[in-house]
UniProtKB/Swiss-Prot annotation:
Disruption-associated phenotype: Deletion of the gbsAB genes abolishes the choline-glycine betaine synthesis pathway and the ability of B.subtilis to deal effectively with high-osmolarity stress in choline- or glycine betaine aldehyde-containing medium.
Summary of the function given for this chain in its UniProt record: Involved in the biosynthesis of the osmoprotectant glycine betaine from choline.
SUPFAM superfamilies: Dehydroquinate synthase-like
Keyword field contains Methyltransferase: no
Single annotated GO MF: alcohol dehydrogenase (NAD+) activity
GO biological process, one term: glycine betaine biosynthetic process from choline
Gene: gbsB
Induction cue: By choline and by high osmolarity in the presence of choline. Repressed by GbsR.
Species name: Bacillus subtilis (strain 168)
Protein name as catalogued: Choline dehydrogenase
Its EC number(s): 1.1.1.-
Pfam families on file: ADH_Fe_C, Fe-ADH
Entry keyword set: NAD, Oxidoreductase
Length: 402
């Protein structure tokens, strides 16, 4: 196996930190109360969305917390692409009720909302003041004890050191984060994932794959992120179609949950790449589902990026399960791109146009993507012209090259 180490990467001063304790297993949710109590929490703000709450998915969590003597304050107003105003409302409730801990149950939006509420609970002002951008304030304090309980296998927010929040005034999704915002504990139970419908399984699963692929190939990659990213790719490639076909396949659900978590770890505290720069900036303008948006973009992004690091894209092909023994590096790299195109088609992911995005927006979207910090981790250099080409591929306005 070729290790594909680059001298310029070895000369960087890397860091990797895991602030989150990870506990997992089928039925793990029954341990929630005792685990949250061990963090010193006696009154928790439970952050979730209306759908999860109405479906009863959060019920066993609430029951376990109460059995452990923990008072539960419910905040079940989470929206997709959570806005600043939602975070403000949640933090006001947290302070008013004198909570001393947070429990997030749901997908990335619920977990990111809880993280951002934690920022406002421990810092002056709004989470907007702590955007990861020049001229903004860095986080100074650890958020209150946060336990994340994912009900999807996609964002990896259960272990990432970032929250993505929408500034509605700017039509812009921004990051806030670092080790101080990460969850203290995550409890991953695949039994909470069986109710995910196939289309959600598809878009969240490809999002997990996208995290792993972008973090494995990004300019900031390091050996430890390579290791977890590759394992995430292997798990997801092996299990995603099974989970899509049969939501009650617990082995597949467990494998996808592990893929999402490992892909989240591969982020570390660094950047990702073009697909997430594009989806994040697009999501601030149009209320698209993040995972579905990323999934529609991954084929064109990989088609552009493979030339930036062909050896790693060839290794990705192996992780996908492709027999590359008789292929050249270039052939294997291209095979990984075509595998992704086929996966998106097999899992019936809607195109960007079907998601409500117009080709007329390409110029604006390309400009916005260039402003996103994840652009700078991309394995192949980007400019507006490059983003323009990728977006045109998303809309089939320019010929395929692999």
């Amino acid at each position: 196996m070729t290790l594909n180490m680059k001298v310029e990467s070895m000369q960087k001063f890397h860091t990797f930190e895991i602030p989150t304790v990870i506990k997992h297993g089928i039925g793990a949710i029954k341990h929630t109360g005792e685990e949250v109590a061990a963090l010193g929490v006696s009154k928790a703000l439970l952050v979730t969305d209306p759908g999860i709450y109405k479906a009863g998915v959060a019920d066993p969590v609430i029951e376990s917390l109460k059995e452990a003597g923990i008072e539960v304050v419910l905040f079940n107003k989470v929206e997709p692409n959570p806005p600043v105003r939602l975070v403000n409302e949640g933090s006001e409730l947290y302070k008013k009720e004198n909570c001393n801990g947070l429990v997030a149950v749901g997908g990335g939006s619920s977990m990111d909302t809880a993280k951002a509420i934690g920022v406002e609970a421990t810092h002056e002002g709004s989470v907007l003041d702590y955007e990861a951008a020049d001229g903004k304030k860095p986080l100074e304090n650890r958020i209150p004890p946060l336990t994340t309980i994912p009900t999807t296998a996609g964002t990896g927010s259960e272990v990432t050191q970032w929250a993505v929040i929408t500034d509605e005034e700017r039509e812009f999704k921004f990051n806030t984060g670092g080790p101080l915002i990460a969850a203290h504990l995550t409890i991953i139970d695949p039994e909470l994932h069986v109710s995910m419908p196939p289309h959600v399984t598809a878009m969240t699963g490809i999002d997990a794959l996208a995290h792993a692929i972008e973090c494995y190939t990004m300019k900031f990659a390091q050996p430890i992120t390579d290791a977890v990213a590759l394992m995430a790719i292997e798990y997801a490639a092996h299990y995603i179609k099974r989970a899509f076909a049969d939501g009650e396949d617990l082995e597949a659900r467990y494998g996808m949950a592990q893929a999402a978590m490992l892909a989240g770890l591969s982020y570390g505290s660094e950047s990702a790449g073009a697909a997430h720069a594009m989806s994040q900036t697009l999501g601030g303008i149009i209320p698209v589902a993040h995972g579905q948006c990323v999934a529609a973009m991954m084929g064109p992004v990989m088609e552009y990026n493979w030339k930036g690091y062909p050896e790693k894209f060839a290794r990705i092909a192996k992780a996908f399960g492709i027999d590359t023994s008789k292929m050249t590096t270039e052939e294997a790299a291209k095979a990984s791109v075509n595998w992704m195109y086929d996966l998106v088609e097999d899992l019936e992911v809607p195109t960007l146009e079907e998601q409500g995005v117009s080709p007329d927006m390409i110029e604006r979207l390309s400009k916005e993507a260039m402003k996103d910090p994840q652009t700078f981790g991309n394995p192949r250099d980007l400019n507006e012209k490059a983003y323009n080409w990728i977006y045109k591929r998303c809309f089939n306005l320019t010929p395929k090259t692999v």
